[in-house]
């Protein structure tokens, strides 16, 4: 679970990490107190997606009229947004990047820092990897003071700022541990002309498996971008909604991201990302119900069952179709344990399961584009839709492919 910036900065302040003077504006505020932090100030949209600066969601304002205009504008262009953060402007000398995240391969945490803050760390890692400093953290002992000093001394700060940096790093680790975080990030950490350090932005991502231990951040339906996203969260189903045409139901993160890339490679667009493999493989009915809440043109189901048996997933898909009567085409490609039984179940339900992921993707893209001339029953033997559609129509209507 990702926290909003204002939530992250509240946590920072509680752990003695300096943040700019600020005020939180609610959407329903009819007379927002935009003057309370002074001018110039920065109006910042509180959304969970990245790239706010590039999208015009962070604006510098110099007076009350500009501030009121930006408040109104940002709420209009982000209608689902509930909050805005207005912060005092900071006199910046340099920007630093710092974070602590999970390093799964080593079973440790890792402290990452760079003098070149204010940019995406992924871009920096590709273009200038030499500017990034990493320090592994053994979770048995936590972040040790000599490790924090080792990082701080390489940031080329003043003596006073270096002392502050050491303490900030130690405090970030305390947050990381206390809140079961996968990531705690400050980007940028401002080194100011007044010889101080201030967190310019903040991210905290809490491990989804530990959210129940963090009741202060419990989210309600209004915190989600859509009803589908909220229901997926309640079910523990990984879900992201986009603006494309093809709804994805896939087993596992790796397969889902691969299919996502294949769809774009074939010229299609994705309406949603949804995983129903692993512990969720028996939730096919709920997964399809969530997918049907998304305005897509086609649902593409791709699975590879190992521990999650293919026939059990197929049973769930068939049950979902019977119960929900989908109003759009469905393309299936199920492989893995008990695959033969899964194929028979899908055929009995009027579906035409495919056996190749790339072919399934191409079929879904064609259907999304309105090319209904062909549906591929196998890789080798494409047949005209009209020949297969009679059986499908009798069972579930004309839109199951």
UniProtKB/Swiss-Prot annotation:
- Cofactor requirements of the protein: Mg(2+)
Q: Which InterPro entries match?
A: ATP-grasp, ATP-grasp_succ-CoA_synth-type, ATP_grasp_subdomain_1, Succ-CoA_synthase_bsu_CS, SUCC_ACL_C, Succ_CoA_ligase-like_bsu, Succinyl-CoA_synth-like
This protein's GO CC annotations: succinate-CoA ligase complex
Q: Identify the domain of life.
A: Bacteria
- Any Pfam family from its record, for instance, is Ligase_CoA
A biological process from GO: succinyl-CoA metabolic process
What are the binding positions for Mg(2+) in this chain? Answer: 185, 187
Write down what this protein is called: ADP-forming sulfoacetate-CoA ligase subunit SqwK
Which source organism? Acholeplasma sp
- Which gene carries the instructions for this protein? sqwK
